[in-house]
Amino acid sequence: MSKIIIATANKGKAKEFEKIFAKFNIEVATLADFPEIGEIEETGTTFAENAALKAETVASVLNQTVIADDSGLIVDALDGAPGVYSARYAGVAHDDAKNNEKLLKNLEGVEPDKRTARFHCTLAVATPSEKTSFYTGEVEGVIAEQLCGTNGFGYDPLFFLPEFGLTMAEIPAEKKNEISHRANAIKQLEKDLVEVVEKVTKK
């Protein structure tokens, strides 16, 4: 069976990709399967740079096609912050609670109609000796004034979806997987999936 590498150790992300490649009889492997690679430092200043950094680094080491993603929250009232620093907004510890606390503090006094935001995801598909391809997806919302919901992770409890009247942490996981920024980026990737599959199967 052919195998595609997803440059992540996140099991949730891996499952999303597994669903796509299963119909092509392609197995999904993650960085958890290659502990010798270790953590790749995200030194880019854009989502595309970080996604490419991860995908190209792993593709070079393993000499095969690799998919990586970089995603985050963009808040208009904060000039795009936390952006590429979303996971470490309150420090390097990737602490969801502290990140949410800092976000709420920085938005104190901001009117509801000025709290517009979006989740963004960029996927990078890297193959050795070939140009890296990029696919993006977003979902629009508003930052709530308090945490609501227990599903999801990260900023989900604060990301309010007006069309549903719920935060991302309140909607069912199945619905989130349909409308999320990552889901929308994957939909773009699916348009070129046959080409990606060919790169994997010819190895």
UniProtKB/Swiss-Prot annotation:
Positions bound to substrate: T8, A9, N10, K11, G12, K13, S71, F153, G154, Y155, D156, K176, H181, R182
Residues involved in Mg(2+) binding: E41, D70
Cofactor annotation: Mg(2+)
EC primary class: hydrolase
Active site: D70
CDD domains according to UniProt: HAM1 (cd00515)
GO cellular component term of the entry, any: cytosol
Annotated keywords: Hydrolase, Magnesium, Metal-binding, Nucleotide metabolism, Nucleotide-binding
Biological process terms in GO annotation: nucleoside triphosphate catabolic process; nucleotide metabolic process; purine nucleoside triphosphate catabolic process
Catalytic activity entry: XTP + H2O = XMP + diphosphate + H(+); dITP + H2O = dIMP + diphosphate + H(+); ITP + H2O = IMP + diphosphate + H(+)
Single GO term (MF): nucleotide binding
Cofactor note: Binds 1 Mg(2+) ion per subunit.
Enzyme Commission number(s) of this protein: 3.6.1.66
Complexes and interactors: Homodimer.
Similarity comment text for this entry: Belongs to the HAM1 NTPase family.
Stored NCBIfam families: PRK14822.1, RdgB/HAM1 family non-canonical purine NTP pyrophosphatase
Task of the protein: Pyrophosphatase that catalyzes the hydrolysis of nucleoside triphosphates to their monophosphate derivatives, with a high preference for the non-canonical purine nucleotides XTP (xanthosine triphosphate), dITP (deoxyinosine triphosphate) and ITP. Seems to function as a house-cleaning enzyme that removes non-canonical purine nucleotides from the nucleotide pool, thus preventing their incorporation into DNA/RNA and avoiding chromosomal lesions.
Protein name: dITP/XTP pyrophosphatase
